[in-house]
A protein has these predicted regions:
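Conserved, single-site charged/polar hotspot
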Residues: 2-485, 493-494, 501, 529, ...
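Short, acidic Ser/Thr/Gly-rich low-complexity loop/linker segments typical of extracellular
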Residues: 436-442, 514-521
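Hydrophobic beta-strand segments within extracellular beta-sandwich modules
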Residues: 458, 535-537
């Protein structure tokens, strides 16, 4: 064993520079693979959805509401909480969520957990610690920090062979978070990987309270402990440097800081217990919230798993994610995210036995269709689950100017709903007012005629959703009568002192020649003969009216 003080050790693919208790490491980089797996367990921590009116200024929006959070397979954590509060013991809870299973004992095992994978990471120990290379050579490190980062290796130094294992009589910190067990460090692609190797029961102490609040009922915590233990043993991986990710790609692992007395007690009370199906450890998937019913493996992943079938989950209603939404998405951004060839015109879904979406077809304005799985859309839009219902709302035109006394036909789509209403806000008003119910055709289309007298904004109203903004500007009717000694006319509606301009066309532009204002009767005039050219009269009355123009006239 070598005592490391103030010098450099060449460690194969790495180089450690220690100055007193402070060390830095330079990894030359290996080509070890760093793969990724699909997320299985889902943490319960997030922000609750607001129940207030949700508004979007986009002309077309996608409003999605749903139930639950997570993949829906296996044990519902909020459901376990609910069952425990209704007097169920943990074994009964587990038997309910994992159909046809029993409990049994597993062999004592160790687990390798990836706790860091970054270009730079810092290890620290408050007491003397050791580093051992792949050949078994060992060196003692003084208490302190060790910064590990990728960089070209320093040559011509005493060598140790990677990977390197760090051990201490106290938990070692990785980027400020303490972990039990031994830490193995290696280069993987462009990153430094830190893998924590420790006993299964010690690992669970950092998992159970990270996946489920430690102040939940004891029986729920016991069910979580058995599920997490089972999932771990069913997913030990060969052929790579670690078994599990230390986050929700597998299970959230918070290390020493996450540990709690109540979670530890639940782990100890169920020590070694696992969920078995026909004598084998079950892949005991779990997730946050079902929304009232769990999913089947067949509808979620395409392959049947006998113990992962839909079951009722009536007691997860305490979860803030039992129901969620509506969440609004700008339809133009959704079309871009889904790589559609034309603007989005709606979504059509096919539901599985549990109500979750199996497939969703995106409809485009050019009549093309693209089909996705429910999971693909969930990932693309960041939805909480695949149990959702989309509503497409669009109001056209987004903007238009009309002449007072005329009418505008508003058209649009309301797919996924039977009824939708129109709201209006006139210039000068601060509140929106109901403007009538719209009749939605079977294909989702609707149309309605509006006759605003002033500039008015319209939008669609469905439940708490307000979307599809259309701005209709209203211009005055300007009448101009040219004569040999000038031009005169009137403005309707009558607005006294409204600004009036005489304009002449110059190429593609219009030049203002003279200005005046309307009298008390809404009349105006410009005196003086006009030279040959094309003219028009512009009136900008304000008071909620847009500028209006007369018909252009030719003077020869």
């Amino acid at each position: 064993m070598t005592r490391v003080g103030r010098h450099v050790l060449r460690l194969g693919a790495a180089c450690l520079l220690l100055v007193g208790g402070l060390a830095s490491s330079i990894f030359a980089g290996s080509s070890l693979g760093f793969g990724s797996t699909a997320s299985t367990a889902t943490s319960t921590a997030t922000t609750a959805t607001a129940a207030t009116t949700t508004t979007s200024a986009a002309a077309a929006v996608l409003a999605i509401s749903g139930h639950g959070w997570g993949h829906g397979l296996g044990l519902s954590q909020w459901g376990a909480d609910g069952y425990a509060r209704h007097g169920w013991a943990y074994d009964r809870i587990l038997a309910h969520f994992y159909t046809g299973t029993t409990l049994g004992q597993a062999k004592i095992s160790t687990v390798r957990v990836l706790v860091a994978s970054a270009a730079k990471t810092t290890l620290a120990s408050a007491v003397p610690w050791t580093v051992t290379d792949a050949a078994g050579q060992k060196a003692v490190l003084d208490p302190g920090k060790l910064v590990l980062e990728r960089s070209p290796a320093i040559a011509a130094q005493p060598s140790l062979a990677p990977p390197f294992t760090f051990a201490s009589t106290q938990p070692i910190q990785v980027d400020g978070r303490a972990y039990r067990g031994r830490l193995t460090v290696s280069g993987a692609g462009k990153v430094v990987q830190v893998v924590d190797r420790l006993g299964l029961e010690a690992y669970l102490r950092g998992v159970v309270p990270s996946e489920m609040p430690s102040n939940w009922p004891t029986e729920a915590l016991k069910a979580q402990a058995v599920a997490a233990r089972s999932y771990t043993l069913a997913n030990l991986t060969k052929g790579r440097a670690f078994d599990l990710y230390g986050d929700t790609r597998d299970q959230a692992y918070g290390g020493v800081a996450a540990e709690s007395a109540s979670a530890n007690a639940a782990i100890d009370a169920t020590k070694g217990q696992v969920v078995l199906y026909q004598g084998k450890v079950a892949d005991a998937l779990y997730f946050s919230t079902s929304g009232g019913r769990t999913a089947s493996a067949l509808e979620s992943i395409g392959s049947p798993v006998p113990y992962l079938v839909p079951v009722a989950d009536p007691y997860d209603t305490l979860s803030p994610y039992h129901d969620w939404g509506p969440v609004l998405f700008d339809a133009a951004k959704v079309a871009k995210e889904l790589k559609l060839s034309a603007p989005l015109a709606g979504l059509e879904v096919v539901n599985g036995p549990s109500g979750r979406v199996k497939t969703v077809t995106a409809l485009s304005n050019d009549d093309t269709q693209v089909t996705f799985t429910g999971n693909q859309l969930r990932t693309a839009l960041g939805l909480r689950s695949t149990w959702f219902a989309p509503v497409f709302l669009q109001l056209l035109p987004a903007a238009k100017t009309m002449t007072v006394g005329g009418a505008v036909t508003l058209t649009g789509s309301a797919r996924g709903v039977d009824r939708v209403s129109l709201e209006a806000k006139q210039a000068g008003q601060t509140e929106w007012s109901p403007a009538g119910e719209l009749t939605v055709e079977p294909d989702g289309r609707f149309s309605t005629v509006v006759k605003p007298s002033l500039a008015t904004q319209y939008r669609l109203a469905w439940g708490t959703v307000r979307a599809g903004l259309a701005k209709i500007a209203v211009a005055p009717r300007v009448e101009a009568v040219p004569g040999p000694s000038g031009v005169q006319g009137t403005v309707h509606p009558l607005v006294a002192a409204a600004a009036v301009q005489l304009q002449q066309q110059a190429g593609t532009a219009w030049t203002t020649l003279a200005s005046t204002a309307t009298d008390a009767a809404g009349a105006w005039s410009f005196a003086g003969a006009l030279v040959p050219g094309t003219y028009r009269v512009r009136c900008a009355p304000g008071h909620g009216l847009a500028p209006g123009f007369s018909t252009s006239f030719l003077v020869q």
